[in-house]
Design a protein with these regions (language model features):
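Tubulin/FtsZ superfamily GTPase core signature
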Residues: 1-129
Length: 129
């Protein structure tokens, strides 16, 4: 197997081959990282996605930021989420895309900059639609 670094792992968990970086951490090394605090977003898009936001809020899911995105202002008003975004308001006038995926896409593209700002810095984003 040419090109594959050869070596052995010592009692401390580190490899003995020069130039290799250990990929596993022991318990004491893990403790130095502290408690992780990831920024997790759950984005519900459209009517179905917004219904999911309501359910997540109702059952009390914690540790995630909930974001509702919709073209229908009335549905968005009745959605429970930490952040709400009405997209395509100049296209649909807040009346919704009527289940038309092409219209929904146009509205999402119109809100691309705002959506990008919302998800920037997130460690993990779940999208439900």
């Amino acid at each position: 197997m040419s090109g594959v670094p050869q070596g052995s792992v010592g009692m401390d968990g580190r490899t003995t081959t020069s130039g290799r970086i250990p990929t596993a951490l022991r318990d004491r090394e893990l403790e130095s990282f502290g408690t992780p605090d990831p920024r997790i977003l759950v984005c519900g898009c459209g009517g179905s996605g917004n219904n999911t936001m309501n359910r997540i809020t109702h059952i009390g899911v914690e540790g995630a930021i909930t974001v509702a995105i919709n073209t229908d202002k009335q549905h968005l008003d009745h959605t429970r989420a930490m952040q709400k975004l009405l997209v395509g308001r100049h296209i649909t006038r807040g009346l919704g895309a009527g289940g038309d995926p092409i219209m929904g896409r146009r509205c999402a593209e119109a809100g691309r900059d705002v959506i990008s700002k919302i998800v920037t810095g997130a460690d993990l984003v779940f999208v439900t639609a």
